[in-house]
Amino acid sequence: MSYPEGHKVIDLMFGLPDIKGLHAAYETFKPLYRDRESKDFAFPAQYMFKDIPNIEDLGDDPVGWAVKQMDRFNIEKALIGVNVFSELHKVARDRFADRFIFDVPLDPNGGMEEVRRLRRLAKEYDVRGATVFPCGCNPQVPINDKRMYVMYAACVDLDIPIFVNAGVPGPRVPMFPQHVELIDEVCWFFPELKFVMRHGAEPWEALAVKLMLKYPNLYYSTSAFAPKHYPKAIINYANTRGADKILYAGYFPMGLSLDRIFTELRDVPFKDGVWPKFLYENARKLLKL
């Protein structure tokens, strides 16, 4: 049950160190906030994340710096978003094509314009997925909303998974759009869709496990959770019937440091046979790497 030192990793949630780009993305959430403290936060869930990595003053090669951090922890490849507020993803594509794969963050409120953008970017980048933050859209978009169905259909057509935040969101915005029970209808209607839950699915992690047992193309990634806070239901599922369904995802540099993540991973009680799948094999198969 010990962590396999030196094992290669695929990180399914990694960010490039562009503080201006990250803050510009966070600004899109602010119209949803009602409390004064949230409006003053530099990071949307700052009340939960106390030791956010410092990515200021990294010199003139921030992408190269990020690759060096990946090397420290045997991260072979990282999934990064094509951030409309930053140009660093272009640098990553042009200089480190063997280290980065891409997802396209979508706002389902955009309808077919978003679908066309997804298709265009899929030709320009090594796009292996799409992402949606239902509670962070403005207006919010529930997981089973008709606006989401357009995005799901496009992902099925492109044969890429969609990564969707599930459970109570960290930012202080209404939670209903991310209720895990809404995933049931989506997986029923789109049996071909590969759907990956992000950001915990709490407090409905037991329901998330039931749905993963029910639907073969439903997965769970550990994004935005320090390993010491991985839900017990998820660890138990990985150690029993779900070894092929649970995937490693970090949250660097948005909220967690790689040092903290990989230090705490050593205390996660996964069985020996689970670790290679969790860290690497499940992502490799899902993303067809």
Residue ranges with predicted function:
Residues M1-L12, I19-R72, K77, G242-L247, ...:
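Mid-to-C-terminal alpha-helical segments outside catalytic/metal-binding sites
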Residues V9, A78, F100-F102, I162, ...:
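Hydrophobic/aromatic residues located in beta-strands of well-ordered beta-sheets
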Residues P17-I19, F85-L88, N109-G110, C137-N138, ...:
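Active-site environment of divalent metal-dependent phosphoester hydrolases
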Residues G59-Q69, G110-A122, E205:
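Short, acidic/polar
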Residues K68-E76, F96, D157-L158, F189-L193:
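A structural motif corresponding to the C-terminal end of an alpha-helix
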Residues E76-K77, N83-G170, P177:
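Active-site gating/metal-coordination segments in enzymes
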Residues R128-G129, P142-L247:
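Catalytic pocket-lining loop regions of alpha/beta-barrel enzymes
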